[in-house]
Amino acid sequence: MKLAVIVFPGSNCDADLLWAVKEVMGIDAEFVRHDATSLAKFDGVLLPGGFSYGDYLRCGAIARFSPIINEVIRFATEGKMVFGTCNGFQILTEIGLLPGTLLRNDSLRFICKSVPLKVNTHTKFTSEYPENVSIHLPVAHGEGNYYCDEKTLKELKEKNQIVFTYQEKVNGSLANIAGICNEQGNVLGMMPHPERAMEELLGSTDGRSFFASIIKNFGKELSQ
């Protein structure tokens, strides 16, 4: 299994993401620039956090026009794994791979802290977490307030697409949503950073089971 970590102008969590999957989890991975046009040698895509293109207009609005995005969309439509954290989540909503949008935090302040999360373990991204587990992951964002219309929220609930839920008030997100997946289950976006919770020295290892789930479920599909 080989993963691509996409690097946009303004990305600042790309190194964290590469370190987490490659050095800690032992997954083959490498950086891919935003202006690349092929992901032919990769099996999955990771969109990192940061401030792509300075977050001008709105978060992810300019990144959606990067040449690599066409390949990311192709990956998703072919059922391959696509994951976006923080700014990566914002980009996934901008390009239409995930429903809804991310608004300014209701406090109008940047939030940087560890938050408790409820995990839906019945997804390919979370199957290695114990049932009914509560985990802690860092967040660091100014625009993480998830919003969608009532019809979309109803569908997210009915189709088991809400993957991570805040267990306390964090940013005003509708239904306390912290992360969602697409209906097919191969695309996930979340505001918290699992790549920053990989070592006890950093305060938590709760992110490891997230990447272990990716290895088990998406890696298994490649070997079949």
UniProtKB/Swiss-Prot annotation:
The active site is at 86 (nucleophile), 193, 195. It comes from the Bacteria. Pathway: Purine metabolism; IMP biosynthesis via de novo pathway; 5-amino-1-(5-phospho-D-ribosyl)imidazole from N(2)-formyl-N(1)-(5-phospho-D-ribosyl)glycinamide: step 1/2. It catalyses: N(2)-formyl-N(1)-(5-phospho-beta-D-ribosyl)glycinamide + L-glutamine + ATP + H2O = 2-formamido-N(1)-(5-O-phospho-beta-D-ribosyl)acetamidine + L-glutamate + ADP + phosphate + H(+); L-glutamine + H2O = L-glutamate + NH4(+). Keywords: ATP-binding, Cytoplasm, Glutamine amidotransferase, Hydrolase, Ligase, Nucleotide-binding, Purine biosynthesis. One of its GO terms (molecular function) is ATP binding. Gene3D superfamilies: 3.40.50.880. Residues 3-224 form the Glutamine amidotransferase type-1 domain. Transmembrane segments: none annotated. It is found in: Cytoplasm. SUPFAM superfamilies: Class I glutamine amidotransferase-like. GO terms for cellular component: cytoplasm. Its EC number is 6.3.5.3, 3.5.1.2. Its main location: cytoplasm. The keyword Glycosyltransferase does not apply. Coiled coil: none annotated. Part of the phosphoribosylformylglycinamidine synthase complex involved in the purines biosynthetic pathway. Catalyzes the ATP-dependent conversion of formylglycinamide ribonucleotide (FGAR) and glutamine to yield formylglycinamidine ribonucleotide (FGAM) and glutamate. The FGAM synthase complex is composed of three subunits. PurQ produces an ammonia molecule by converting glutamine to glutamate. PurL transfers the ammonia molecule to FGAR to form FGAM in an ATP-dependent manner. This is Phosphoribosylformylglycinamidine synthase subunit PurQ. It comes from Enterococcus faecalis (strain ATCC 700802 / V583). The gene is purQ.
